[in-house]
Amino acid sequence: MKLKRFVSLLLCAVLSLSLLTACGDTDDVITIAVPNDTTNEARALLLLEELGYITLKDGAGITATVGDIEDNPYGIEFNEVEAAQLPNVLQDVDYAIINSNYAIEAGLNPVEDSLAMEGSSSAYSNVLVVKEGNEDTDAIKALQAALESQQVADYIASTYDGAVASTVDNPGDGYDDTIDYDALAGTTITVAASPTPHAEILAVAKEILAEKDITLDIIEFTDYVQPNNVVESGEVDANYFQHIPYLDDFNEQNGTHLVAVSAIRVEPMGLYGGKQSSLDAITE
């Protein structure tokens, strides 16, 4: 009886130790929150691949999802979250990969606060978008000229300290010589945008257009869907919030007819620490 009791106690102790070890392993799993829309999720995963933490399947490219991860040597657990909500879940995960506009909006400085950033790439330049067929209207050309101005380029450089960079090669004076601005006087151009930095940049263009008695009505949205829907429906003239890979994917998925008019600036995506303060925890 004593032997059986000893064996039982020994088995219980081993089982308890195993359970504790398992719990400890669970606690050691690194969680990284990434955007759940196709193109931004791909950007996040490509950044992690560049850093050496995962390997993606050949050809996954700019439409990669977590299902395209071929090798995950550090056992990272991925949480797919709406891009705008990533700053809100940062405290609940080890890391989050966040678009610069949402990081800035949440009070984060992409240059100072991120642990890693993707390189600037024109593939992800944010663009002015209109419905197909409206690209060459004087109103849109006037808005484009204002956004491609030296005033906007200077504002971006002085305001965002490298977190946002202008992609306009030869900024102008804000006006298009081919437009009859007198004919546009008294008109209103409507544009949908996310608050930061898009609406802020548009505010500079608004001042430029106001010099010609043109009103720029900036309508703010906090999601990535409605700004495209209102341009497709004709409720709004243009939008300014997205990059071309996202636009192409949106058109394909929704049957919309939206086109990019001009690339204005790029925002490198950043990897931010939540529960962790350095990247060392991933490989430890």
What are these regions, as identified by a protein language model?
Residues Y124-A142, P268-A281:
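A bilobed periplasmic-binding-protein/Venus flytrap-type ligand-binding module shared by bacterial periplasmic
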Residues D92, E105-M117, D249-V261:
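Ligand-binding "clamshell"
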Residues E82-A83, Q91-D94, I98-I104, P195-T196, ...:
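Beta->alpha turn/N-cap motifs
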Residues A44-L45, E49, A139, L147-V168:
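Periplasmic-binding protein-like
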Residues D37-E41, A183-A205, Y224-Q226:
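Extracytoplasmic "Venus flytrap"
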Residues A60-N88, I218-N229:
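Short helix-initiation/N-cap motifs at beta->coil->alpha
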Residues S18-A22:
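C-terminal motif of bacterial Sec signal peptides marking the signal peptidase cleavage site
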